[in-house]
Each structure stands twice: as structure tokens, then as C-alpha cells.
Regions:
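Elongated, amphipathic alpha-helical interaction scaffolds
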Residues: 1-202
Length: 202
């Protein structure tokens, strides 16, 4: 009898993880998983809106945030491609333009965050060569892509500091070590909010 492999639903785990990462600043942010961009089936993985414009987000992965923050997540099996960049960039332009009033959302109020497990070398080389964008490492697993109207960052989950970004950093297929799993379970223990409950994928 052939063994069936259980498929891990990575996106619900990501949606829970991204919210937990900002748990100390929830009052500043509004999370909208799978935010629909239009009546047609076009959606972004996560839209994070700053509740108060004058409050800065202190979390390391949110320091780049402005008012409207568009997040694209790739599962550990997936890769971030050049097409993905332009798709999400197009979504960001659409989100900025799809308003009641002209210029209701200013481009500088929109940021783009790409989250993936593998460093997208081909995509980065393309952006450097054809769009003259620059990339620099801001912190462990955090890269800023500069030179565009939209502030853009790239998060490589396996490179993130587990002390600062435990939940996103744990979105990997190789979380197998006994100590690591025990630590995650201990951290999870006693959390009864819905966001933590969704992380029972582990």
C-alpha cells in the first residue's frame, strides 16, 4: 500500500506567523489575510495597514512599513521569480489606483515585502541590471531593495534570527531537531488566541 504524504498548508501558517511576529504592536496594525484586490479572483497574500500614521513599527521586519504594506509569501517548496516580482508590483500599483478619489493613496505610502525560503538570485540580478535597483542587507535575513518609488524588502525565512523572528523563521521543512521542536511547543504552550491556534500545523 502506497504511503500518502500529508500536504502542509503553508499559507495559513504564514498568516499566523506574520501576525505573531508583530504581537507586541498589534494595536498599531490591521491584518487582512488574502486581501481581495478586486471582484475578480486577484488577491495578495497579506495586507498590513498601519492604524496610526504617526506611530513607527519597531519590529525588525516592519521598520520599513508605511501606511499600506503588501506582503507576498512563498512556501519552502516555492521560489520567488522575476514574474512574481512584476505580478506583486502590479498588484501594488493596482491597489494604489483602485480608490474612490484620484491619488487617495500616495505611492510612498505603499511598501512591498517578499517572504521566501530561498534567496532569489536571478530575480535580484534582473532588478540590478534592468531596473538599476540596489540591494543591501539590513539585518539577518532582511534585505532592502532601494531605488524604486515603492519601498521594498526581501525576507529570507531560513536566515532570520530565531530570537527575533521565531515564527517566520520556523516556516521551514527542516524543523526536526528535538530541541527546536520542544522550544516551539513550549513557546506555543498557554497561547489561546486564535492566531496561535492556527499554528498547530507543527
Amino acid at each position: 500500500m502506497q504511503e500518502t504524504t500529508k500536504r502542509i498548508e503553508w499559507h495559513p501558517a504564514f498568516q499566523a506567523s506574520i501576525q505573531i511576529e508583530f504581537e507586541n504592536e498589534w494595536e498599531k496594525l490591521s491584518f487582512e489575510p488574502e486581501h481581495l484586490l478586486s471582484k475578480k479572483p486577484m488577491q495578495i497574500d497579506e495586507l498590513i495597514i498601519k492604524v496610526k500614521d504617526n506611530e513607527k513599527v519597531q519590529k525588525n521586519i516592519g521598520k520599513i512599513f508605511r501606511k499600506y504594506n503588501i506582503i507576498e509569501y512563498k512556501s519552502p517548496d516555492d521560489y520567488l521569480t522575476i514574474n512574481d516580482f512584476y505580478k506583486v508590483y502590479g498588484y501594488s500599483c493596482f491597489y494604489q489606483a483602485d480608490t474612490e478619489n484620484v491619488f487617495e493613496i500616495q505611492p510612498q505610502e505603499v511598501t512591498i515585502t517578499f517572504i521566501c525560503n530561498h534567496y532569489p538570485r536571478t530575480m535580484i540580478q534582473h532588478l540590478q541590471k534592468y531596473r538599476d535597483l540596489k540591494i543591501h542587507k539590513e539585518g539577518a535575513g532582511i534585505y532592502y531593495i532601494t531605488g524604486d518609488e515603492f519601498p521594498i524588502q526581501l525576507l529570507i525565512t531560513k536566515e532570520l534570527n530565531p530570537e527575533e523572528n521565531l515564527w517566520l523563521q520556523s516556516l521551514r521543512k527542516d524543523v526536526k531537531g528535538k530541541r527546536e521542536i520542544e522550544f516551539l511547543l513550549k513557546t506555543y504552550e498557554g497561547k489561546n488566541i486564535q492566531t496561535y491556534i492556527r499554528l498547530q500545523w507543527m
